[in-house]
Amino acid sequence: MQKTSILIVALVALFAITEALPSLPTTGPIRVRRQVLGGSLTSNPAGGADARLDLTKGIGNPNHNVVGQVFAAGNTQSGPVTTGGTLAYNNAGHGASLTKTHTPGVKDVFQQEAHANLFNNGRHNLDAKVFASQNKLANGFEFQRNGAGLDYSHINGHGASLTHSNFPGIGQQLGLDGRANLWSSPNRATTLDLTGSASKWTSGPFANQKPNFGAGLGLSHHFG
């Protein structure tokens, strides 16, 4: 209950910051955008390719909008297909989203997230976020995850994320992810990226385990 209260306070504080920050000027009257069918295909070093297909519809303009999306994602070689949907609100870089996913035989997840833009000069972008999720595994085991993080992105496709997660009754975990764009097609639809990740349990029964590291080189193509 105490951690839930802390998360609620954090959400309220984040939206207070959002209201205090100046809004970017709008680019015109609100308009209804057409539905967009898109997706991506990314090579996976472990085998096959990670494919995603999504249908998106937004109402608004680039600075102020509501976006709904349904999607399906999976590996072409193995594993079940994850399906889900997202409803997101954005106002000059600040916003919130709700996401529900279902992976047959694995788990169901319902996640709530709020974010605020801290810096954006057209080349560098930095966002802060808070999140909470309710997770149910196929065997019936349920657990919660909540936390906060920072997301950085560069106009050339590079990026990094630092996330602190709390699993009530289990422990806390710190994670770092990075991405370096090595090549992009002229329209940026196809990219070659080097990715890396590191995570470490900082409390709980897994705190004595060594950090987990990962790296990969992936070719991705986005369409839609």
Curated annotation (Swiss-Prot):
Induction: By bacterial infection (at protein level). It is found in: Secreted. GO terms for cellular component: extracellular space. The keyword Signal applies. Hemolymph (at protein level). Keywords: Antibiotic, Antimicrobial, Cleavage on pair of basic residues, Immunity, Innate immunity, Secreted, Signal. Residues 1-20 form the signal peptide. Residues 21-34 form a propeptide. GO terms for biological process: antibacterial humoral response; defense response to Gram-negative bacterium; defense response to Gram-positive bacterium; defense response to insect; humoral immune response; innate immune response; response to hyperoxia. Belongs to the attacin/sarcotoxin-2 family. Hemolymph antibacterial protein. This is Attacin-A. It comes from Drosophila melanogaster (Fruit fly).
